[in-house]
Every structure is written in structure tokens, then in C-alpha cells.
């Protein structure tokens, strides 16, 4: 199977037998080209597992930049940085974001001046990244080139690309009296998603172009993976950039559910799904993507009823343990995704 064929909503769902032993599997993975559409923490931890499961594969990560925000004149790219720090060994493991061992002297000094916003935690080490990125952007480098420069230090072991060099901003339409629209970070970090969302707008997406290398990475991929990222404001934002969803539809795609037992592992995927009228379940997320995008779908063992769910007709569903409690667990999940892809491609 080489992806969806015919019209964009057609899908071939034939599934071959189980993959062979570990040795042949590893041999087949050598030189395999994998493209991953990634959000932040969940994607970064999955990518560590993927790197472990397929150390010789060529992995390109297309990162969500809809969360990017300007703070104190600095261009902050939360999801790109989370992937870069995690794979480069500099992440705050407890938080899942930000730099390890960071301090907040600069933020405290800004607060003493009464300068805001004070609701977004920028650590001192993290600020160095944003200063360097902002300086490069000011010198005329596109975000993709600036990301490449930052990755020279961190050596993440993957090619990390922003979804676009153009400005795309995820905005949240609040379900309040005024129907206000706020930046996603303000809704999530400042408001803690306490005000229900009525919907989401990917401002600028219609006029954006995929960053250099993005469409090529998808077109040349043997496999596209959707990690357990937010399907609406992470993967959904990436797919909103013209040309990306169409390219993905032509490939074999395996996704990992971010919902276990009816609740997100972390984050607010349930609130986002509710805002667009989708069910916060493994079945609901799989159906949201649909057979036009997904060929295979991994759900947790407690959601094994999804394997035969009629809403997921045309998608090969497998139930496995999905909690990424440590690197071995993340590796097992990534390996299961690769095994399912090999079944689909047999």
C-alpha cells in the first residue's frame, strides 16, 4: 500500500500479516525515510522512541508553529523548541518543556519594572534561544533557516522544519459574551482553558506556503507518522497550510491516539475536540482524521473496542499500551507504528 489512491477520500484498507522477526525488521528500517508531523511534548517524547526504534532511518519532523508568539519583542517557537531541546538532551524533563536547570532572573526583573506579560514562563537559558532566533529573523533569515542554525548546537538527530516560514497564528474563539478571539497561548497558559472555546482560527494559513523541504520530505517519505499530539491545534494547524494535507493523503500514514480511556494524556485535546464537535475518545480522534488521512491507528489497550468501531472503517486499528512512561515505552510505541506501516505496505 502506498497511500490513498483515486479521489482524495478513497482508501485501500487491506492489511497483510504480522511483521517478521526483529532482525529483518531492523534491516528493512535502515535508510527508511519517515516524516513526522509534530506538536510539542507528546510528539517530542514519541520522537525519542522513534529514534531508538529506527536509529538508521532518515527522519524529518515538520513542527507546528501556530503556537509561536512574540513576547518582549522575542520570537518564541514553543513546539519547535520542545522537540529540539528534548532530542538534544536539554529539556526540563519534569515539565516536558523549557530548559533543564533554568532560572527566571530576567522574568523577575521584567516583572519588577511592571513589564508584561507575566503569565508566560521564559527562563533565562530559554531566552538565549529566543534572542538568537529573533536576531537571525531580523537579519533576514527565514524561520526554517534559523531553526537549522539552532539545531547545529542541539544535534537532535532529525531534520527539524517549521511547517511554514510564513506567519500562521492559532487563535481561539472564546465562548463568552463578547465572542472574543485570543492567541492560543493566552487561552491555554493565561486562562488555563477555563473559558470554553467555541472554535479555532488558523490566521494566515490560507496565504501561507509550506517551508522549504516540507513537501519534499512528505513526497519522498516511505511513511508519515502522526504522534500523540493535539489533533486540532497541533496536527490540525500543520494540515491547514495549503498543500500539506494533500501531500499527506498520498502517503501511508499511521497515527497514535493522544486520548486514553476518554481523556488526554496531557494537555487539553478534549477541550479542543469539544469545540469542533468531535468526541474526546480514541475513536473520535481517529474519525476526526478519517480514512482520507489515516491508514493505521494505534489506540491504548483500554480502548480496544476501537479496533472494530464502524466509525473507523477503512483504517487498520491496533490496541497496544500507549502510556509513554519512559524511553523503552516510547520505543515500543514507535516500533508498533513502524510494524503497522510495514503490514500496510506489504
Features from the language model and the residues they span:
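N-terminal glycine-/serine-/threonine-rich phosphate-binding loop
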Residues: 25-98, 190-221, 329, 334, ...
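Short, conserved loop/helix-junction motifs that constitute active-site signature segments
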Residues: 52-57, 245-251, 290-293
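Short internal beta-strands
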Residues: 60-64, 253-259, 296-301
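Electropositive, gly/pro-rich neighborhoods at or near active sites that engage anionic ligands
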Residues: 63-202
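Internal active-site segments that recognize and position negatively charged phosphoryl groups
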Residues: 156-158, 171-246
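C-terminal functional extensions of proteins
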Residues: 266-346
Amino acid at each position: 500500500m502506498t497511500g490513498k489512491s483515486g479521489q482524495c477520500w478513497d482508501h485501500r484498507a487491506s492489511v497483510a500479516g504480522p511483521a517478521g522477526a526483529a532482525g529483518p525488521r531492523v534491516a528493512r528500517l535502515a535508510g527508511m525515510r519517515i516524516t513526522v508531523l509534530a506538536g510539542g511534548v507528546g510528539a517530542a517524547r514519541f520522537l525519542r522512541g522513534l529514534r531508538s526504534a529506527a536509529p538508521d532511518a532518515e527522519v524529518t519532523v515538520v513542527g507546528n508553529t501556530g503556537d509561536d508568539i512574540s513576547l518582549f519583542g522575542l520570537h518564541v517557537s514553543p513546539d519547535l523548541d520542545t522537540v529540539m531541546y528534548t532530542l538534544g538532551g536539554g529539556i526540563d524533563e519534569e515539565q516536558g518543556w523549557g530548559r533543564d536547570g533554568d532560572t527566571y532572573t530576567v522574568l523577575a526583573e521584567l516583572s519588577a519594572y511592571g513589564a508584561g506579560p507575566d503569565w508566560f514562563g521564559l527562563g533565562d537559558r530559554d531566552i538565549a534561544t529566543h534572542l538568537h532566533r529573533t536576531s537571525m529573523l531580523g537579519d533576514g533569515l527565514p524561520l526554517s533557516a534559523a531553526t537549522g542554525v539552532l539545531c547545529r548546537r542541539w544535534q537532535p538527530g532529525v531534520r527539524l522544519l517549521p511547517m511554514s516560514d510564513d506567519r500562521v497564528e492559532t487563535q481561539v474563539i472564546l465562548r463568552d459574551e463578547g465572542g472574543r478571539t485570543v492567541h492560543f497561548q493566552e487561552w491555554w497558559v493565561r486562562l488555563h482553558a477555563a473559558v470554553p472555546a467555541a472554535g479555532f482560527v488558523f490566521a494566515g494559513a490560507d496565504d501561507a506556503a509550506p517551508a522549504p523541504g516540507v513537501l519534499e520530505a512528505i513526497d519522498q517519505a516511505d511513511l508519515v507518522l502522526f504522534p500523540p499530539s493535539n489533533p486540532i491545534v497541533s496536527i490540525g494547524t500543520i494540515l491547514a497550510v495549503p498543500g500539506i494535507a494533500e501531500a499527506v493523503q498520498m502517503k501511508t500514514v499511521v497515527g497514535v491516539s493522544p486520548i486514553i480511556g476518554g481523556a488526554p494524556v496531557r494537555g487539553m485535546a478534549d477541550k479542543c475536540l469539544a469545540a469542533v464537535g468531535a468526541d474526546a475518545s480514541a475513536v473520535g480522534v481517529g474519525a476526526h482524521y478519517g480514512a482520507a488521512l489515516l491508514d493505521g491507528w494505534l489506540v491504548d489497550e483500554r480502548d480496544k473496542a476501537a479496533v472494530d468501531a464502524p466509525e473507523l472503517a477503512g483504517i487498520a486499528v491496533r490496541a497496544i499500551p500507549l502510556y509513554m512512561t519512559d524511553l523503552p515505552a516510547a520505543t515500543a510505541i514507535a516500533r508498533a507504528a513502524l510494524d503497522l506501516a510495514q503490514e500496510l505496505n506489504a
